[in-house]
Amino acid sequence: AWMRAPYEPQEGQPADYRGYGTMTDEAVRDANRKARERKMQLLAHCNGDGACGQYLDCWEQAAEEERTEREKRAGGRTPGNDRPVMIHAQLLGLDQLARLKALGMIPSFFLAHVYHWGEDHVRNFGWERASRISPAGSALALGIPFTLHQDSPVIRPDMLETLWCAVNRLTRDGRILGKEERIPVWDALRAVTANGAWQYFEEEEKGTISPGKRADFALLSADPLKTPPENLRDIRVLATVKDGERIWGDGI
């Protein structure tokens, strides 16, 4: 992860080691420019707050270019209409959230990191920074819509484990990593349903079970809203339905 401040001391690395970027600023700006010209949504993989800052800088420049262009013509698209996505946003700084919101950018958090590698983050970045990884609670407080993902095949595609991670934020050692970043079950469910559809411009046909929308849903062994938070990952998927047809399971 490319960081703004150095890692905790790392064997074989200088004391000021911060990781490094994989793209130049110009390459990021060029990708942004091409995406906007072709009216394509842009999603960028950003782990450290250094990479997050580079992506935000790119979009802030795009926003300024759009404002200048709108002075020359009426109407037009804005960066917010493009719904750019920041994938992982693992070590996104809390001070960067306001910038992200102003741009209409969507963070998609790989929140299972808290359980699978939370203790590694503590060793690499110290407790304070590690406790802020995947800051879903702070994003929620600011009214920023976000989604959750598993990054399969890095880990298995288990959405219920991800819900459990978002609500409890327990590491493998059983420690709560970032109590203030935990979110309610309802908001975790929205992050993987309605917000997911909205992220990909599909909110008119997916994301909620509503009249006129596609009948895409999963049948679970228990109601997540009535299940003790510590037991969320024990809920089983009994069946999945797509366009009204059962495609997996025999629960219905």
Language-model segments: which ranges?
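Active-site-adjacent helix-turn-beta-strand microarchitecture at beta-sheet edges
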Residues: A1-Q41, E69-K72, L97
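His/Asp/Glu-enriched, well-ordered alpha-helical/loop segment
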Residues: R33-L43, G50-P84, A89, L94-K226, ...
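Glycine- and charge-enriched low-complexity intrinsically disordered segments
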Residues: G249-I252
